[in-house]
Amino acid sequence: MGSVMSIMSAFGLAGGAGAKAFVPLLLLGGFHYTPYFELGGRFAWIASPLVMVVLGVLVILEILVDSVPELGEYADTVAYLPKIVAGFIAFAAATGSIDENLTQLGVSGVLGGGTAAGVHWVRNQIRRPFREVAESLHDGAARAASIGEAGISTAVASSAILAPPVAIFALGGFALAGFGLSKKLSGRNAACPNCGASVFRDALACPSCGSEI
């Protein structure tokens, strides 16, 4: 399937797709024009100017959608599909396994898509407390969280291309830091005295029933 470094790069790119689906693909297209990375012939389409423009628009749309607290769990569920597909493409592009037999193509799909899905699941567990803060306090918190996820995806995917081992450690580090912060935020939640929904302790109103606290 490829060297150890290319496999590590593939996992890093797929992990980045789990944070934001289209960021790693856009970076793959961009790095294709540098001395640091070259897409295989079957993946050269990713570096097409038209495709990169479309990917750029999709990145912006994904950030905007994730910035809307009202979409919440619906967006989290729907996002599995594009992230699994993006993880598969990124993994296969890094290893070049689509040029091989169907078995290796299937392995790329399982590993790449599975990695992206796993990272997205972790992201969802971390994001829930942030979403409660965004709904209870200010919409800007949701926007900041979404932009932060795009930044993490960019950092992980870029390091996956330039220094693959760093990407693996970065994924673990971001996950641990995120879980720690989300646990801290979860501990600051309280029940709404009117409807019983979970709200941030400093909230002035309940996002579920709209009553003042």
Protein language model features and the residues they cover:
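Helix-coil boundary and interhelical linker segments in multi-pass alpha-helical membrane proteins
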Residues: 1-5, 31-50, 90-108, 159-168
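Alpha-helical transmembrane segments of multi-pass membrane proteins
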Residues: 55-65, 112-120, 176-180
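Cytoplasmic-side transmembrane-helix entry/capping segments in multi-pass membrane proteins
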Residues: 73-85, 106
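Mid-bilayer segments of alpha-helical transmembrane spans in multi-pass integral membrane proteins
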Residues: 85-97, 105-125
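Short cysteine-rich clusters marking metal-coordination/redox-active sites
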Residues: 192-195, 206-209
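Cys/His-rich microdomains that often coordinate metals
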Residues: 199, 212-213
